[in-house]
Amino acid sequence: MAPSSSSGLTFKLHPLVMLNISDHFTRVKTQLNPPAASCATGNGSNNADAMLLQNPRVYGCVIGLQRGRTVEIFNSFELIFDPALDTLDRSFLEKKQELYKKVFPDFYVLGWYSTGSDATESDMHIHKALMDINESPVYVLLNPAINHAQKDLPVTIYESEFHVIDGIPQSIFVHTSYTIETVEAERISVDHVAHLKPSDGGSAATQLAAHLTGIHSAIKMLNSRIRVLYQHIVAMQKGDKPCENSVLRQVSSLLRSLPAAESEKFNENFLMEYNDKLLMSYLAMITNCTSNMNEVVDKFNTAYDKHSRRGGRTAFM
């Protein structure tokens, strides 16, 4: 396992970066993954190639900005990797960098991304090749393997540091912590992706069930995290764990940020909103009933007029 970073930088990762990397990997895997029949006819010498096709590596750059000691990664774009030379296509990188600079003049290249379970020695060669663009690039690694037991995001951010190993200074990867940062537009987009309709349209009941399932999962995870936090505080009160003032301050700040559900103003606003919803439902029902009644009256008048004209002609004849 890579050691922890000592740079003191704070990293903020936006969901758009993870979506771009995941989409990039999915597209490449779909294009390169051979049919099952051709895989079955291959010999043992092609097992390594088959594994590479099943789990291809993708590469790209991450862009964003740095404010003081805070590095915020906003977006990413794809790069072309030359497996023969084990390097990135620099001309393509420079063209993409110029295009993104026109659209996002405040953003610059912070580093690069790839997919895999862990950083490798070949990754360090790519990392060093990007140091002429950014002297301290970051490496965002997404693990595409599905692990249902893992609750954290399969994303690791690495920095490079010089460490003396066996008397020789070497550059090694050190992993650093990060937080997920979102803006309103990203929250709306992620929520839209999470609630996409099925290809056949789906029924209202199916969509409602999926929505309620998502809410239930979120509440279940929130409940488990609150239980862990509560048990930790109880252990500190009993003296089983050392008292951490930083944790207590964060818990106190979290509790103060929650709205007071028992205040008079909250009850007043709740009742007002509740009555407004009832009034809207009542007006919608009245409008629907009025529309149905008008249709019945129109049909009755049409049928009565035809009967009257038919009866008149019969009497005249």
Curated annotation (Swiss-Prot):
<dbReference type="GO" id="GO:0000338">
    <property type="term" value="P:protein deneddylation"/>
</dbReference>
<dbReference type="GO" id="GO:0009585">
    <property type="term" value="P:red, far-red light phototransduction"/>
</dbReference>
<comment type="subunit">
    <text>Component of the CSN complex, probably composed of CSN1, CSN2, CSN3, CSN4, CSN5 (CSN5A or CSN5B), CSN6 (CSN6A or CSN6B), CSN7 and CSN8. Interacts with itself. In the complex, it probably interacts directly with CSN4, CSN5A or CSN5B, and CSN7. Binds to the translation initiation factors TIF3E1.</text>
</comment>
<comment type="similarity">
    <text>Belongs to the peptidase M67A family. CSN6 subfamily.</text>
</comment>
<feature type="domain" description="MPN">
    <location>
        <begin position="11"/>
        <end position="164"/>
    </location>
</feature>
<comment type="function">
    <text>Component of the COP9 signalosome complex (CSN), a complex involved in various cellular and developmental processes such as photomorphogenesis and auxin and jasmonate responses. The CSN complex is an essential regulator of the ubiquitin (Ubl) conjugation pathway by mediating the deneddylation of the cullin subunits of SCF-type E3 ligase complexes, leading to decrease the Ubl ligase activity of SCF. It is involved in repression of photomorphogenesis in darkness by regulating the activity of COP1-containing Ubl ligase complexes.</text>
</comment>
<keyword id="KW-0963">Cytoplasm</keyword>
<dbReference type="GO" id="GO:0008180">
    <property type="term" value="C:COP9 signalosome"/>
</dbReference>
<dbReference type="GO" id="GO:0008237">
    <property type="term" value="F:metallopeptidase activity"/>
</dbReference>
<keyword id="KW-0217">Developmental protein</keyword>
<dbReference type="GO" id="GO:0010387">
    <property type="term" value="P:COP9 signalosome assembly"/>
</dbReference>
<dbReference type="InterPro" id="IPR024969">
    <property type="entry name" value="EIF3F/CSN6-like_C"/>
</dbReference>
<keyword id="KW-0607">Phytochrome signaling pathway</keyword>
<protein>
    <recommendedName>
        <fullName>COP9 signalosome complex subunit 6b</fullName>
    </recommendedName>
</protein>
<keyword id="KW-0539">Nucleus</keyword>
<dbReference type="GO" id="GO:0005737">
    <property type="term" value="C:cytoplasm"/>
</dbReference>
<dbReference type="Pfam" id="PF13012">
    <property type="entry name" value="MitMem_reg"/>
</dbReference>
<dbReference type="InterPro" id="IPR033859">
    <property type="entry name" value="MPN_CSN6"/>
</dbReference>
<dbReference type="Pfam" id="PF01398">
    <property type="entry name" value="JAB"/>
</dbReference>
<dbReference type="InterPro" id="IPR037518">
    <property type="entry name" value="MPN"/>
</dbReference>
<keyword id="KW-0736">Signalosome</keyword>
<dbReference type="InterPro" id="IPR000555">
    <property type="entry name" value="JAMM/MPN+_dom"/>
</dbReference>
